[in-house]
A protein has these predicted regions:
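A cross-family phosphate/adenosyl-ligand binding-site feature
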Residues: 1-184
Length: 184
């Protein structure tokens, strides 16, 4: 199946939600990979992630404003509605809040909303193996909860050491497999 056929079957708007992590600058390359697969990409940042990436450059690359804050109710939506979401990089903090249903940022609000709508979501945590946070009881509990909610969590630090920094092509291929499964 070509990339064009893949997206016609699955929708064409992809939200990439990016958290404040050292690997956040990698989102720029992931945007390019997704665009090559003909996704219309929109980037949503956690408030702290705005300090880790070049917001203006991401807006220019995607052709959409990069959002990190809620809009006022009377303001029109600046972004098209997403058909799928990839959370990369997903941090310990965001995963735990999301699993508890806390929506105190735009990124978390969208994740909670789309989880409830059963939309395809792929989360790629960047939690260092044996770094302490991976052993915190809340982390794996949150991963299990999100999976039970229908979220696909790609956490394979043994394959992508040390922090599960998965290449964009692998993330997109995993998303494609999720979309194919959901369409059957």
């Amino acid at each position: 199946m070509s990339d064009t056929e893949r997206n016609k079957a699955s929708g064409d708007v992809l939200y990439i939600i990016t958290c404040a992590a050292g690997s956040a600058p990698l989102v720029q390359e992931f945007v390019k990979v997704a665009q090559q697969a003909e996704w219309d990409v929109c980037v949503i940042l956690t408030p702290n992630a705005t300090q880790f990436v070049d917001v203006a450059q991401l807006a220019q690359l995607t052709g959409h404003p990069v959002r990190s804050e809620y809009k006022r109710p009377e303001d029109p939506d600046a972004l098209p509605r997403a058909d799928a979401i990839v959370v990369f990089p997903a941090t310990f903090n965001t995963l735990n809040k999301w699993a508890l249903g806390i929506s105190d940022t735009l990124a978390l609000g969208l994740l909670c909303e789309f989880t409830g709508l059963k939309k395809p979501i792929l989360a790629v945590p960047v939690v260092r193996k044996n770094g302490g946070l991976d052993a915190h009881p809340a982390f794996m509990r949150s991963v299990r909860l999100l999976r039970r909610y229908g979220v696909h969590v790609f956490y394979e630090p043994e394959i992508y050491p040390p922090r599960n920094e998965v290449p964009g092509e692998v993330i997109l291929d995993t998303l494609h497999k999720i979309l194919v499964r959901q369409s059957q």
